[in-house]
Amino acid sequence: MKTKFRLREKEKIFKNIRENGYAILHNIYSKKRINRVKNSLFSMLNYIKFDDKITDLQEKYYQVKDYNPNLKAHFYDMCAFELETRLALHDPIILDLVKGYFGTDVLFSGRPAIHIHDSENERFLEPHQETNMFSKDFLFVWAPLYDAKNDQGGLLIYKNSHKHGYWKHKVDNKIGSTNINLKKLKKF
């Protein structure tokens, strides 16, 4: 796995972020690193509902969800404190990129979050901006644990929307989360 980007590679990444609002970095994490995150999440779920017959993280998630939705929700909340995810977020290659992008050695980090693609999830978020950050200047890092497909497990990014600053959000959906009027996003 790559441990550092060359200066030219960094400049290309930074240009993509400035122009498009994002950059796609392929294969940043090794399979070993991803498996450590998956295994840790699996262990958390297996602690909630032990079953030595199930060894797949996704299957385990649905088992816990069926067993006790409240405990599944607590698992989701606890993921922000799970160390393997934090280690991945704070991987030296990511930190080096962020320092280079902002031209600083001083970094602050938010908490990692897990997005679980579950079509039955009532807390599915509508289009929104990540606005609850330390600063207006930040980079959002998203790394799938499984290969993302067009119709699931992905993240929708509205190219160039970052050039319009912060959008007015509303709170009119069934879960009371902030979201952006979809009509305004049609131009992207």
Describe each PLM feature range.
Residues 1-19, 26-127, 132-133:
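Non-heme Fe(II)-dependent double-stranded beta-helix
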Residues 23-25, 139:
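Generic beta-sheet signal
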Residues 39-40, 141, 172:
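Residues in and immediately flanking transmembrane alpha helices
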Residues 110, 120-128, 138, 151-157, ...:
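A short secondary-structure junction signal
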Residues 129, 143-147, 159:
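Short, structured patches in soluble enzyme cores that scaffold and shape functional sites
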Residues 134-150:
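Short, conserved beta-strand element in jelly-roll/cupin
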Residues 150-188:
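Double-stranded beta-helix
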